[in-house]
Structure formats: C-alpha cells, structure tokens
C-alpha cells in the first residue's frame, strides 16, 4: 500500500506523489498541501473527497497532446499560468469538450506549477484588469481521481489515456478526451495541437452562442469594409493615420481568428489593451480633430468584441481551480507561512469584490455631470480640438533651400532651413506625377505615417509634410554624417566592433518597427544614416508595409508561419542585392525579409561587398536562391561568431531564419555576448563625422550621375485644383513640430500669469536680484545689441512629456544657427524683450518674434521660475551663463554665474559655437569664456534632454570643457531629518592613458521622495561643489566632512556625468600603481586669481593664439578642450573644437584666394584668425614635452583637423584662386599672430579612431565626396612660382612664427632628428607598410579611407607607378596600437634628385613621427618609411627659407638666426616628413 501511495503506476501514466517532490500526497486527501509543502510549491490539482465521480483526464494522443503555449500577456511574466491552458475547455463528463484537472499524461517530466505565480486578480467577470480567465464551464460537475483507484478504474484510465475516442459518463453523454494543460513555448512540438484545443473550445462556444459569433463576424466585416484606409480618405495627421491602419488590422485579425475558430478570452483581453494603448497614443500625440474619428472607430470595435469576450470568459470559468485556490489559501493560513489576514477577506480580494458598488455609481453620476458640462461648453472648447485651430499649416515658403543632399529613385532630399527658427531640416521632395503614374500615392502616405508615428532614437523622425504644385514634401530631421554605404565606399570593410555596434543599433530599430507591424522591405547600408555622434538612424520607408502589430497571443508556431507570409501581393520590390528568396519566388513574405537583408548588411560591413552579385538581376536572384555564401579566408577570415550569425540570418527557409521568432533571437546570439544593449547610445562610436560648416553635406553622395530631379518649383500653368482630394490630405504636422508654432501669444499670457503667481511669494528675495538684473541690462544695451531668442522647449520624446526646457539661442550673425533633432523640437518659441518703464525685474515678458531695438543680452541674470509642475532646464546654444536649473513647483532658483566685463562679453559673443538643436536634445550647451569652456554630453542621462544622438549633439569636434562651475545653479537640499536621501561614491578619474588620477564624486543613488530628490538631485550627477567649495580632486573623507558640516541645509553644484569628458571604462589592471594627483583646498577667489595669473603668464611667453586642451578619461569616449583667442585679435574666431597643437604649421596654396564669409566654426578666411586657431596639417604629429610622464599628443576626439595639402598626390585640376578654401594656412601672412604654440602639457586626450578629411566646395567632378577639400601640389607649385614679393607684414608674420617655434622646441624633452636632405623643396608622402590586400580587392574606396584597422605587420613597401598617382588619391589614416600621433598616408613614388641649386637652398628638416615609449620598444608593431618625394622647383627670389623645427639645440640656434635675417615669400614651403626612428641628428 505504501508503494502505491508513493508511486501510482498506470500504463502510459506515472504519478509521482512522493513527498520529496513537494506535491500533494495521498495522506491528506482533503487538504491541498501537506505540512511539508509550502504554498509556492503546490500543484494546481489536489485530491478531494473520494465520493466524487472518477475523473476523465486528458489524452496523450498526438492530436490532443500539449502544444506550444503562445499566450503570454506582457504583464503576466513567466508564470506557467500565463500559458493558454486557462482558455481551454473543461473536461467533465457532463460537458462536451470539457477539460480535466487531474493527473496529466506528461507528469513524468517532473514539471511543477507554482501557485505563487498565480495572478492576484480574481476570476469574476467584473474585474476588467484580470489577466486570467478560467478554463471550464460554470455548469460542469467536478471530478477527481479516486483516492485509491480500483482495478476497474485503472483499466478505465489506461484505456482512456491510450485512445482518442469518447467515453460515456454515467449520464450517457459522449465526452471526448481532452489534452492536458498547455505549457510554455518549446521547440519540436506540433503547431496544430493548440489550434485543435481552441477549435474545440470555439466549437462549444458556437454551439452554445451561435448568434453571438455570427453577429461579431458580421460587424467586424462591416468595420473592415467601411473604415479600411484604402476605402476612406487618408487622415491628415500621420500619427492618426498609422493608428487607423493598426485598428483595421486588429479587426481583420480578429475576424480571421473567429473564422478559424481560434478565439480565446485572453485574445480579446489583449485586443482591448492594444486598442486602449492606441487611443492613448492618439490623444497624447495628436492635436487634430481627427482624434474623434479614431476614438469612434476604436470604441466601435470594442463594442463588437465585448459580448463575445464576456461569454467566453464565463464559458472558460474553472470552478475546480477556484476551489483549489480556496483550499490552498486555507492550508497556507493553517501552516502560518503566508496569509495572516482574514481568509474571507483575502478570497474576496482575490475575486475582485472589494470595491464598493455604490462608489462606481457615484463616479458614473459624476462622469455624467462632467459630460453634460463639456457638451454645454462644446462650442467654446472641445478637448479634442487643439487650442489654436487657426494655426498656419506648414508650406514650402516657410523653408529656404540650402543645397541638395542626395538623389533617389522617387525624389531628391534637400537641406533646408526654417526661415523663422533658423533650424535645419532634410526635406524630401517627391514628384507627384511620378507617384500617380506608378500608383504610389498610398505608399507615400504609408511612409509619412510611419515616420510621423515612430519615436525611437534609431529611427529618423518626421516633423511635417505638405504638398506643392508638383511635389509632396516631407520635412525630416537632418542627420549629418552620411550613410553607411558611403562610409563603406570610402573605408572599405569595417572593423568587427564597429560593425557590431552599427548592426546592433539597426537591430533595435528593426525590433521597434516589427513590434508595430512595420516591415521595412528596403534595408541596406544606404538607408542607415550616421548621426553626429556616430550612431545609426534608419530611414527611407518608401517601400515599407504595415501589418499587424505584435501580439503575445500570436506567438505559437502556427501563427508564426502565417506571419512569414503576411503579405501575398507577389510584389518583388527592394534593392536586388538585399531581396530575400521568398520575395523572389513570390511565395508571400513578412518580417523575416528584413532579417535576410540584415544578414547581407552584416556580411557587407565585415567583408566589404555583398555575398551575392551579378551583372543582371536575374543572375543575382539565381545566386540568392541557389548559391552558397563564399567566405573570405586566411587573414581576412571572419570571426566564427559573426560568420555563424550571418549564416543563420541568410537561411533560405524563412521559418528557420534567425529573427523570425523575434528580435530577441538575434540579440541573444553569441556575436553580441559582450554588448550592452541598454547602453548602446552611451558608447562612443569609432567613426564620428566632423562637419566643417552648418550646411556641410559632404558626407552624402548626391548621386547626381544616377538620378536627376528638377529642383525648380512648379509650372505656373499648373493648377492646384488638379491635385486629387487624397493628395490634399498629405499636409500634416507632427506632435514634436506643431508645438513650436502653437499660439504663442496665448501661451505667453499663461507664462506671465505663472511667473507672477510663483514669484509673489519670493518678491522680497528677488527685489535685490531684480535691481541688479535691471542695472546689468542697461549697461549691456550700450555694449552689445545682439538679439537673443529665448525659446521654451519641450522634450517630446516618449516618457518625458512632462518636462519642458528653456533654451536660449543667440541670434548673432556670428553664431551658427540651430538645427532640429528627433525629440527636442521646441514646443513654444519666445524671445526675451524688455518691458515698458514699469517693468519689474522679477517678471520678464516673453513675446514671439525677432528682437527689435535693444534687447537684453542672453547672458543677463534673469530669474526663471517654474511653470506649475514644469521642470525647466536651459539648453543654451549660445548664452554665456544660461544654466540648467531643475525647478520644482513654486521654487525659483537664482542664476549664479560670473559676470563679465563688456569687453570680454563682446569677445565671447563672437566665439560662441552653438550647435544644432539636436545638441540641445542631448546636452547642455555652455560656451563660457571665463573658463574657455563649451559642453559635451552623452546621449543618455536623467538630465540629458534626449536619448537621440542626432544632428551634431555634443559632437566632440566642438568646443568642450570640464569647467563645470557655471554649468548649473546650486541644488539646495533641506533635510529635516538625519539624512539627505542620496548615496555618494568616489570614483577614480585617470588623466588620459597615464596612471595619474584624481578623485571625483558622483551621486550613486537618490531615494524617491527624499529631500535630495525633491531638490532635483539625480543619480549619475557629478558633484563639483559642496556649499560653494570645489570638491574636484578632494578625497572622499574631505567631501563627507563638508557634507556633515552643512547641517540641515547643503548646497550642491552638479553636472551630468555624460556632460563631462569623463569616460566610463573597465577597471585598470595596474590600478595599484596609480598615483593620485592631490589638490589642495583653495578658496574660489584664490583659484580664480591663480588661473588668471597663469593665463597671463602663458600669454606673455607666447605670441600666439592660446590653445589649451585637457581631457579626463576613466574609460566613455568623451574628450573636451577649450580655446580662447587673444583680446587683441581683430575678430574672435569660432573654434572648431578640440585642437591638437602643432609643431609645424601647414602651408596652404593660393594666399590670395578669397574665402566666402561663413559662420562655420571650422571655415575661416584670411581676414579672420579662425584659420590660425585651426590645427594645421601636421598637428597630428605632436611631440612629447618635458615633464610629461604619460602619452601626449593623442588626437582629440575627432577635432576638425584638415588633411595636409602635402599628403595628396598631384592632381591635374588647374589652380582656381577664387575657389573657397576652408582652411587657410596658419602661416598665411594675414595676421602677425599666427604661429601655433599649444600648451602641450595639457593635451591628454583619448584617441579616436576616425579622421575625416573635409573637402573643397569648388565645382569639381564628383569622383570622391571625401577628397574635395584636399589641395593639390600643382596649386602650390604654381603659387610658389608666381613670383610674388614678401611684404613687411609677411616678414613680421614669419618672425613671429619663428619665435613661436623657438618656444616650442625649447620645451621638448625628446631628441627629434632633423635630417637635411640635399634636395629641392619636397613633399614627402608617407605610406604604412604592408597594407591589407582587402583594400584593393574591393572597389569601395574611391575616396579617403578614413580608418585602416589592419594589424601592423612588417613588410615591403608598396610602390605605385607615377602614372597611377593621380588616380589613387585615397588617403589612409593609419594608427599603430598605442601610437600617439595620427599620420595620413598616401601612395607615391620616390624621386630623389640632388642638384647644386638644391644645396644652395635652405634644407628641409625631417620631422620624425612622434610615438609613445611603448612604440619605441615594440618596433615590430609597425615601420614607417618615406615612400614618395614630390620636388617643387624654386629659383631666384622665389626660394622659400625652410624652417628648421626639430633640430638639435646647437644647430637650431644658428639656423633660426639665419632664418630671421632673410626675406621670405608669402607662402611657406612644404615640410618634408620622415618617420624613421633611427634618423640621424645633425
């Protein structure tokens, strides 16, 4: 008997009832659990009284066995009860298709269901939030396994388990056997099993309620017929258009499932949740009146499924399971392990019966009253009608076209600027006639809807759309970095890490799109744009299809197979190299086609070309269908994990293809094992584009040779009435764009009211501050009349709709305008203007429009107070002291920035470099010349404005600094108790690559509701000051001491960690050897004095433009630098950003070339010292300086250093003196102060792997978009032979240059050999030894190859014939491991010639390539050799004395003295480079 209790063995069934498994034992038949089995281990079936009828348990037959469980609601977690077993039929002998709850055929697998995972919601139909529906009819009679089954019962059970035939119960009814409960998704099981069970349940449902099913299907068909987007006029609002499409898709899917008898109550529940989410999106993201249409349509669909849903829920109710819950609760209460409260109260709460029924009636009455009031006031205010219905729609006249970005098959994309806001956008113009002829009108509406609806940092977003006479225009965010196809063309194959990041970000974009049912159908590198931070944005949805959004009830294999053939239009579209086999074979397709294209893209990233190619599409398609992938071998072989990923993505069968089951399959691949999917935007990209100007589109290929679209506007003969009514609906405004142009007058009124109400309580505090503000304004009005626009911006990205931001942008003509980014389109636009004579300081007024008269400076100290619950934070792109200020309601924080003298303010105005508005999207932009600072931010932070890395946000090529003392007003924390509510942590911040570190402190955690949280402190903030005292460099004990001395009130000044240059990286292996750079405590006044004293000391020593740069790194590839121009300069230039000081300024051709005036921070003219601040061509060759124990001269993170004209091969292009030159040489004789004398001691920058060569804008053949700016040697030679005489200014210019070079050479600590070549003036071109042959095997580098990631191997020099020098102008930026300098390598041939005339000329010194100490020790890492010399003949007075830069001190003195005494020409001769480590010293 004991063995029977322990193991009840039945043929084809094994019941393990041993206590070790903590299952219910037979020792306690009336209790669901034994004393040793806690509640969380209970099994959902229990033994009841033995007088019940024998239980008919499930059949193990193949047709009724357990299938895959697809039905898991997102809120249900991973509980076994989330599987769809609860929606199956009940198995009782008195009810057809009833399901059982006894021992199951699969008990042998040891699965234990946990009662603790049961949802807390009840089983009643009065709880709409219930995620659990029962599995049985409410009319069934419950059955149970016998306590001790007899032989007859065993025979009956075994016969039942072995057969699929029905059994007859005591009442004579036929009862079919049912399958056991379904469980979680597992491979290898039949996909039809689950469908069979649901079909039987639906059969019961249709038998019981035949009219309900027929009525639902009829109404669903009616909705689809009358409201289908193809049958109705498209909605003008893109978001609503997309939601409209999704609602119809949901109705169509419900109809298909009903006809296929696959309906469950859980499906209805999820359908209701999807509809509610769509309605919420419609109300939150649209202000159109068409919201009412979406609201009506969604409610209509909800009413259709309401009755069937209730009936199914009742039909699936499982009283046995309910009884089991009661017994389990009772047993658990007896044991005392869980429920301590009243058992009936617990059960009632589980049933959802705790609500007061009268409360709902009161709420309904209240709702009726509110509804009547709203109806009465409908004429005056409709909640669904925007507050400004008369707002002007966008039109083409609102934008001015700057230039063409690129051409496509359907239209062209132009860079445009909004005339009012001066923000840049990309405008896609599609010819309407072409659309009509190709019947593509509906498709362009789909593209508009997708772009408008999408809110994802990896998807390009649209701001507005409109139609003209000949075009449909879509205004999108401008992503400046070009596309990945151009990058591949110029670089060749990408390194694995770079490919992994690009691919991973595209996976996230694809996952987002697929969740909303969007199939891109045209994925390719051309449609992957690169943001200014080097991240990816997916664009071009012109061929996309919108299907059904993801539903968790559709995850079983049967539906997955249906999803792979979601579209049966038999249309072959896309780019041939990326089209999936099922599309070619016209078998129907779905989301897996995008994963096929992703496999092609990854292969192309890593190899450099696509795996399948052919001369014709037919040949290409034949390879796609039949051929295998050819993998590169040898040194070019791909890593095993990447090859495996590509192989799985390129499976011919779409069901076997990785990604078909969801993006999670791809994300879990070993190729991404080390990838942080949540921190992709925080990663520093290896390639960061560098923009030369506000309108720089040089990273894009215009493709004018392939496509040509008329840019002129329409014929006057064309009539607007000719456009169809459908096309007229194309004009729309997205949520993020419409906020800018909403009724600002109305908002300004509300703003003033809010200011007055919040400031009255602080009037006494602000009176003194306001007077000072007024006096400051009166002083500044006379000094500077530059207009300022103060715009209240709103961060409209998801999850941050309650935050608004104040952004001040300078309207100075010397300052770059802003551009828009994805999530940070300004919601309201205001400009600050002084009020009338009775103006009060604490009440600034905001009005719309440009400033006229004498507006206050944007740097004025005005008080900004909170607007109700709105948190304000400055996104200054030009304001001196506009600081971020997190404000709570009714609390105003004073701006505490240092005031400048008027002279310094005027100079700082000209040197501000405001970026695009997408910079404001991600970071705080501060250009504070007190500290020579800009800003730098990382995409993600609680304080950063957006996770969108678009349009030049915090581009490292802009000015940046860690001078955080003016970044944010102090956060004052008032603590009434013993704690402030935040956790402090000290971090080591290493100086560059060295072992020297400083201690910084960051906020590790902030408790919700604590005083620190209420004051605005957030986790991840770097603490810079405590009670006004700087804590940068203080040890942890000192900082804690400062906090403890504060008492109940502490003032903290913080900045987001990603707004600094601190990189986050792994712990250093040799951290024990680190040396902390301790800093003594000084008062702020003393620090300022010391800073000024050292600054003047440096200025007095050097007669050059002061450049300081410093970077801290502890691993986030961020760097920062600052630059200041001398007050004596005629105009203060716009610094291009991080600048690497140079030993040898580069010569530039055409000194008389006229460069157009530009507001670019990187473009300069001879009349501006901006060119002198620009790093010259050889700035990448920075030496080591004395007293430096760690690497220096490592290139700042992608500063805009132009390539040297010396590094390019001769070009047959004739000289064009009038062509604009972006980078005049710092040695041009325009200004006396032009030499470079950087403070090398502070150049501690992390390396960046990419170097972009900007290009000339002259009208050249579009052979290579990345080489247009490179100067040709012929231009230089022609200029050198032009016979121009030197002027006294030129002589002074050269003398100052020599002085600067003297100061630099005296500070060095390395012996730099200066070999004197017995040759004429030469241009030496360097080439890295033994380049990979992969670069030559793929024809993808017609232009500059910006990065070479080949392993450095010693080998022979590859010589290029003379006749090929002009053809191969592709420079390779090579970097050795641990190398501190960046060298541009070009191919050329060595032509050494020595003449008597050459020996009589001053000789060119050789500048040795400066490398780190580790490089000198590891010479096997790579060898640099001089490969080509390009002689430039000089004669007579045209000879240029050549500067001896790096000779020995003994010889350098005499050489320099001779140099000073000579007359010199206007253009310096180019320098000869040599990097031989064993160069001889003279």
Swiss-Prot record:
Its EC number is 2.7.11.1. It catalyses: L-seryl-[protein] + ATP = O-phospho-L-seryl-[protein] + ADP + H(+); L-threonyl-[protein] + ATP = O-phospho-L-threonyl-[protein] + ADP + H(+). Residues 1070-1085 have a biased composition (Basic residues). Pfam families: DUF1908 (PF08926), PDZ_6 (PF17820), Pkinase (PF00069). GO terms for molecular function: ATP binding; magnesium ion binding; protein serine kinase activity; protein serine/threonine kinase activity. The keyword Cytoplasm applies. Residues 23-39, 59-74, 129-138, 175-187, 793-810, 866-877, 1109-1129, 1155-1169, 1218-1232 have a biased composition (Low complexity). GO terms for biological process: cytoskeleton organization; intracellular signal transduction. InterPro entries: AGC-kinase_C, Kinase-like_dom_sf, MAST, MAST_pre-PK_dom, MAST_pre-PK_dom_sf, PDZ, PDZ_6, PDZ_sf. Its cofactor is Mg(2+). Residues 759-792 have a biased composition (Basic and acidic residues). Residues 1-87, 116-143, 163-191, 755-810, 830-915, 936-965, 1061-1266, 1449-1482 are annotated as: Disordered. Residues 673-745 form the AGC-kinase C-terminal domain. Transmembrane segments: none annotated. Residues 968-1058 form the PDZ domain. Residues 75-87, 117-128, 904-915, 1242-1256 have a biased composition (Polar residues). GO terms for cellular component: cytoplasm. Belongs to the protein kinase superfamily. AGC Ser/Thr protein kinase family. This is Microtubule-associated serine/threonine-protein kinase 3. It comes from Xenopus laevis (African clawed frog). The lineage of its organism: Eukaryota, Metazoa, Chordata, Craniata, Vertebrata. The gene is mast3.
């Amino acid at each position: 008997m004991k063995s029977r209790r322990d193991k009840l063995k039945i043929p084809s069934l094994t019941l393990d009832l041993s206590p070790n498994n903590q299952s219910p034992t037979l020792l306690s038949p009336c209790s669901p659990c034994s004393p040793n089995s806690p509640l969380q281990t209970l099994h959902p079936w229990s033994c009841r009284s033995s007088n019940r009828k024998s239980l008919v348990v499930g059949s193990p037959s193949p047709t009724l066995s357990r299938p895959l469980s697809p039905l898991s609601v997102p809120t249900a977690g991973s509980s076994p009860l989330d599987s769809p077993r609860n929606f199956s039929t009940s198995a009782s002998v008195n009810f057809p298709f009833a399901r059982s709850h006894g021992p199951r055929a699969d008990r042998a697998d040891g699965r234990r269901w946990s009662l603790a995972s049961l949802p807390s919601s009840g089983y009643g139909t009065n709880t709409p939030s219930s995620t659990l529906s029962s599995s049985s009819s409410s009319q069934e009679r419950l059955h149970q396994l016998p306590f001790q089954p007899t032989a007859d019962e065993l025979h009956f059970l075994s016969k039942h388990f072995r057969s699929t035939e029905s059994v007859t119960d005591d009442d004579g009814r036929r009862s079919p056997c049912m399958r056991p409960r379904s469980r979680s998704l597992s491979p290898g099981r039949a996909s039809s099993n689950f469908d069979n069970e649901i079909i039987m349940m639906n059969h019961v449902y249709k038998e019981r309620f035949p009219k309900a099913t027929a009525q639902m299907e009829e109404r669903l068909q009616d909705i689809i017929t009358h409201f289908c987007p193809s049958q109705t006029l498209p909605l003008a609002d893109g978001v609503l258009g997309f939601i409209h499409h999704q609602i119809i898709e949901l109705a169509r899917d419900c109809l298909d499932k009903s006809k296929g008898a696959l309906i469950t109550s859980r499906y209805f529940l999820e359908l209701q949740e999807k509809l509610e989410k769509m309605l919420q999106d419609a109300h939150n993201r649209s202000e159109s009146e068409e919201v009412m249409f979406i609201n009506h349509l969604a409610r209509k669909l909800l009413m259709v499924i309401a009755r069937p849903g209730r009936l199914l829920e009742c039909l699936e109710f499982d009283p046995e399971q309910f009884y089991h819950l009661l017994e389990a609760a009772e047993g658990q209460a007896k044991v005392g392990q869980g429920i301590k409260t009243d058992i009936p109260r617990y059960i009632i709460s589980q049933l959802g019966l705790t609500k007061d029924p009268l409360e709902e009636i009161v709420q309904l009455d209240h709702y009726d009253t509110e509804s009547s009031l709203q109806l009465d006031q409908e004429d005056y205010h409709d909640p669904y009608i925007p507050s400004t219905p008369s707002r002007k729609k966008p039109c083409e006249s609102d934008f001015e076209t700057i230039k063409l970005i690129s051409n496509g098959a359907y239209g062209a994309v132009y860079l445009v600027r909004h005339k009012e806001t001066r923000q840049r956008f990309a405008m896609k113009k599609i010819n309407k006639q072409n659309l009509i002829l190709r019947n593509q009108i509906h498709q362009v509406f789909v593209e508009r809807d997708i772009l408008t609806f999408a809110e994802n940092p990896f998807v390009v977003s649209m701001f507005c759309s409109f139609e003209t006479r000949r075009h449909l225009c879509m205004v999108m965010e401008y992503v400046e970095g070009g596309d990945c196809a151009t990058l591949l063309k110029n670089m060749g194959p990408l390194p694995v890490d770079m490919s992994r990041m690009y691919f991973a970000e595209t996976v996230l974009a694809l996952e987002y799109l697929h969740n909303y049912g969007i199939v891109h159908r045209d994925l390719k590198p051309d449609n992957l744009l690169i943001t200014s931070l080097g991240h990816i944005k997916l664009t071009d949805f012109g061929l996309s299809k919108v299907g059904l959004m993801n539903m968790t009830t559709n995850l079983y294999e049967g539906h997955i197979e249906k999803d792979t053939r979601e579209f049966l239009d038999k249309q072959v579209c896309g780019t041939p190299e990326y089209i999936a086999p099922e599309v070619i074979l016209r078998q129907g397709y779905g989301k897996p086609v995008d994963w096929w294209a992703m496999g092609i893209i990854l292969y192309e990233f890593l190899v450099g070309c696509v795996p399948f190619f052919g001369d014709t599409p037919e040949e290409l398609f034949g390879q796609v269908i039949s051929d295998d992938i050819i993998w590169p071998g040898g040194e070019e072989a791909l890593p095993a994990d990447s090859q495996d990923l590509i192989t799985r993505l390129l499976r011919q069968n779409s069901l076997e293809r990785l990604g078909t089951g969801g993006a999670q399959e791809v994300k879990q691949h070993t190729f991404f094992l080390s990838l942080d999917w949540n921190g992709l935007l925080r990663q520093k990209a290896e390639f960061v584009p560098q923009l030369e100007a506000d309108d720089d589109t040089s990273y894009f290929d215009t493709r004018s040779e392939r496509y040509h679209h008329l840019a002129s506007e329409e014929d006057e003969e064309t009539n607007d009435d000719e456009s169809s009514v459908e096309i007229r609906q194309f004009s729309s405004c997205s949520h993020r764009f419409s906020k800018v142009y909403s009724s600002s007058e109305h908002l300004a009124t509300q703003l003033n009211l809010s200011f007055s109400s919040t400031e009255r309580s602080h009037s006494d505090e602000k009176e003194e501050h306001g007077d000072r503000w007024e006096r400051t304004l009166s002083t500044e009005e006379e000094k500077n009349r530059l207009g300022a626009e103060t715009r209240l911006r709103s961060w409209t990205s998801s999850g941050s709709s309650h935050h608004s931001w104040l952004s001040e942008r300078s309207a100075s003509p010397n300052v770059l305008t802003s551009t828009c980014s994805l999530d940070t389109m300004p919601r309201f636009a205001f400009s600050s203007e002084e009020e009338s004579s009775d103006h009060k300081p604490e009440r600034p007024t905001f009005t719309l429009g440009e400033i006229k008269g004498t507006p206050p400076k944007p740097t004025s100290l005005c008080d900004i107070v909170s607007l109700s619950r709105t948190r304000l934070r400055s996104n200054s792109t030009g304001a001196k002291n506009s600081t971020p200020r997190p404000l709570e309601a009714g609390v105003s924080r004073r701006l505490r920035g240092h005031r400048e003298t008027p002279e310094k303010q005027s100079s700082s105005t000209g040197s501000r470099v405001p970026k695009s508005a997408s910079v404001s999207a991600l970071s705080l932009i501060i250009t504070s010349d007190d500290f020579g600072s800009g800003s730098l931010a990382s995409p993600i932070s609680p304080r950063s404005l957006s996770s969108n890395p678009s349009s030049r946000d915090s581009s490292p090529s802009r000015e940046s600094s860690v001078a955080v003392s003016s970044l944010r007003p102090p956060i004052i924390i008032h603590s009434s108790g013993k704690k402030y509510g935040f956790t402090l942590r000290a971090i080591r911040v290493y100086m560059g690559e060295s072992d020297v570190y400083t201690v910084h402190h960051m906020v590790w955690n902030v408790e919700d509701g604590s005083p620190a949280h209420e004051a605005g402190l957030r986790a991840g903030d770097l603490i810079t000051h405590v009670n006004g005292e700087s804590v940068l460099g203080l040890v942890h004990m000192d900082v804690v001491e400062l906090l403890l001395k504060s008492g109940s009130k502490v003032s903290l000044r913080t900045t987001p960690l990603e707004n600094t240059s601190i990189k986050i990286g792994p712990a250093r292996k040799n951290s024990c050897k680190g040396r902390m750079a301790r800093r003594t405590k000084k008062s702020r006044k003393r620090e300022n004095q010391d800073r000024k004293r050292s600054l003047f000391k440096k200025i007095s020593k050097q007669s050059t433009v002061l450049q300081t740069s410093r970077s801290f790194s502890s691993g986030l590839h961020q760097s920062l630098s600052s630059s200041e121009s001398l007050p004596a300069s005629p105009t203060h230039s716009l610094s291009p950003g991080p600048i690497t000081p140079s030993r040898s300024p580069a010569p530039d051709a055409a000194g008389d070339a006229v460069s157009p005036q530009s507001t670019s921070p990187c473009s300069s003219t001879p009349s501006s010292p901006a060119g002198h601040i620009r790093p010259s061509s050889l700035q990448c060759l920075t030496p080591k300086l004395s007293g430096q124990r760690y690497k220096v001269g490592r290139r700042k993170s992608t500063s805009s250093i132009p390539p040297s004209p010396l590094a390019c091969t001769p070009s047959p292009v004739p000289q064009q003196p009038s062509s604009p030159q972006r980078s005049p040489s710092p040695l041009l004789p325009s200004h006396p102060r032009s030499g470079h004398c950087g403070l090398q001691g502070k150049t501690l920058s992390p390396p960046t792997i990419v170097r972009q060569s900007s290009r000339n804008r002259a009208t050249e053949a579009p052979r290579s978009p990345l080489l247009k700016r490179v100067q040709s040697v012929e231009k230089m030679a022609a200029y050198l032979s032009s016979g121009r005489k030197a002027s006294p200014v030129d002589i002074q210019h050269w003398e100052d240059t020599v002085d600067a070079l003297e100061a630099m050479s005296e500070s060095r600590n390395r012996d730099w050999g200066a070999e004197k070549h017995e040759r004429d003036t030469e241009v030496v071109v360097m080439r890295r030894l033994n380049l990979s042959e992969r670069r030559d095997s793929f024809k993808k580098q017609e232009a500059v190859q910006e990065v070479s990631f080949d392993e450095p191997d010693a080998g022979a020099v590859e010589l290029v014939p003379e006749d090929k020098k002009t053809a191969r102008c592709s420079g390779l930026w090579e970097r050795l491991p641990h190398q501190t300098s960046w060298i541009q390598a070009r191919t050329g041939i060595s032509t050494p010639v020595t003449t008597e005339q050459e020996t009589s000329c001053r000789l060119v010194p050789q500048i040795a390539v400066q490398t780190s100490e580790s490089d000198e020790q590891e010479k096997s890492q790579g060898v640099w050799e001089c490969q080509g010399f390009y002689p430039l003949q000089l004669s007579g007075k045209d000879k240029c004395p050549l500067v001896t830069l790096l000779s020995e001190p003994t010889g350098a003195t005499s050489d320099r003295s001779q140099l000073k005494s000579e007359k010199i020409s206007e253009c310096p001769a180019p320098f000869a480079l040599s990097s031989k480590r064993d160069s001889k010293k003279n």
